[in-house]
Amino acid sequence: MAFSVQMPALGESVTEGTVTRWLKQEGDTVELDEPLVEVSTDKVDTEIPSPAAGVLTKIIAQEDDTVEVGGELAVIGDAKDAGEAAAPAPEKVPAAQPESKPAPEPPPVQPTSGAPAGGDAKPVLMPELGESVTEGTVIRWLKKIGDSVQVDEPLVEVSTDKVDTEIPSPVAGVLVSISADEDATVPVGGELARIGVAADIGAAPAPKPAPKPVPEPAPTPKAEPAPSPPAAQPAGAAEGAPYVTPLVRKLASENNIDLAGVTGTGVGGRIRKQDVLAAAEQKKRAKAPAPAAQAAAAPAPKAPPAPAPALAHLRGTTQKASRIRQITANKTRESLQATAQLTQTHEVDMTKIVGLRARAKAAFAEREGVNLTFLPFFAKAVIDALKIHPNINASYNEDTKEITYYDAEHLGFAVDTEQGLLSPVIHDAGDLSLAGLARAIADIAARARSGNLKPDELSGGTFTITNIGSQGALFDTPILVPPQAAMLGTGAIVKRPRVVVDASGNESIGVRSVCYLPLTYDHRLIDGADAGRFLTTIKHRLEEGAFEADLGL
């Protein structure tokens, strides 16, 4: 029986894919779920696994051909259909004849992963990992075919456009088949693997011979060269070296990290994405003291030199954009195309806030366990203003011509991470005090940088704040996060000479701490006067500086 290999749906809006490389040639034998061909879309590069075991009898789409979703890529025939091509396949089985008993067992194992698949085996499905997440990419399998697993034991790592997480096993048993290989993209509800419950897997010893058709395990030295090609870079590290996924290798290359010096924290010492990010952060810190020693009195220059060592190796090269960079590119372009954006900027005198923070920060840090930055003050002022101006905390539906006015303030915060820009959301931020906001902001920013965000923390925002002043910028023109109607930038707080008016109306020149607040808003919903009133409310709240009660002063 022949099986058609078709271009799968590799994303919500992906309609086609381009064949980049065939991993098998016509006449080659393939196993079920063995990587067959590499394809590229505008969102992801991935490998397409074989839908059946057999022989690749015909390649229909050549390399560099673009094929629509559902279009035919190749044909897989079973050994009988393949004729001469099938002959080499049986020869591999007799090659293992010194162990005459295990040799007959591999064929039953393949059906075992297929037979229970129909009724006895429990499918492991791609779960919903967020409000608007429709698919996930397999980063790394934590178990191999034949391994025993417990209920809720981590089985596979997956990545979405919002979060990386581990999928637990839904039942206890044995992993009998893997349906989605590493780097494969699977829609929500799609099958990742199958678990045979312990009672159904009477052939518990079968896992030992089973790996022979699948060239993964280390027991047979001759089978090892087969898995080496996917991990070509670590191949020189001998048999005991842990497997490194393409995603991790790419991340290491982007950050100029030598994987030989990275200690893996994954199962069996495997190097995970978090290990590479931690090594990159450690490398950055190690290089930071040099500029600090030369200009100890000026903390600001520490930040600019740090990115240079990590990115210097990119000069003169062409690199594939990371997943987050591709998502950012698409989302920002779509935002500008779908909304009518413009930006209004107000200057704010932050002198009182600067004084309050200086008086309270030591006691605040001791009491709350986090540093008191300026961001909680901005967030509190924004929340108060959103409650007064509900047309800013709203969204416009172009299709239904309706405006939704939200009854809660879900604040997003733009966070610069090693992977790229993320905008995690503090839900119901309007219910938090200044101290509560400080703790929540510190927590969500730290988890965004370490990759430990929950899926729902990257969606559902009604308004976003971006701290453009963290790198010294005075003002910017933020790009909206649809369906949000506005985003506020907070510029660097700098000292400037300003006209100061006393209670009697007398004017003088004084040194004041000021910053700029640029507000980007959707003109389909918000007029310039609305934006001005909203910014004026924030300005008055900050210049008044009445936060003593929040700070215990």
Curated annotation (Swiss-Prot):
InterPro entries: 2-oxoA_DH_lipoyl-BS, 2-oxoacid_DH_actylTfrase, 2-oxoacid_DH_E2_comp, 2-oxoglutarate_DH_E2, Biotin_lipoyl, CAT-like_dom_sf, E3-bd_dom_sf, PSBD. The active site is at H523, D527. Binds 2 lipoyl cofactors covalently. The modification N6-lipoyllysine is found at K43, K162. The keyword Lipid biosynthesis does not apply. Keywords: Acetylation, Acyltransferase, Antioxidant, Lipoyl, Repeat, Transferase, Virulence. GO terms for molecular function: antioxidant activity; dihydrolipoyl dehydrogenase (NADH) activity; dihydrolipoyllysine-residue acetyltransferase activity; dihydrolipoyllysine-residue succinyltransferase activity; disulfide oxidoreductase activity; lipoic acid binding. It comes from the Bacteria. Residues 2-77, 121-196 form the Lipoyl-binding domain. Residues 81-125, 204-238, 278-321 are annotated as: Disordered. Component of the pyruvate dehydrogenase (PDH) complex, that catalyzes the overall conversion of pyruvate to acetyl-CoA and CO(2). PANTHER family: DIHYDROLIPOAMIDE ACETYLTRANSFERASE COMPONENT OF PYRUVATE DEHYDROGENASE COMPLEX (PTHR43178), LIPOAMIDE ACYLTRANSFERASE COMPONENT OF BRANCHED-CHAIN ALPHA-KETO ACID DEHYDROGENASE COMPLEX, MITOCHONDRIAL (PTHR43178:SF5). This is Dihydrolipoyllysine-residue acetyltransferase component of pyruvate dehydrogenase complex. The gene is dlaT.
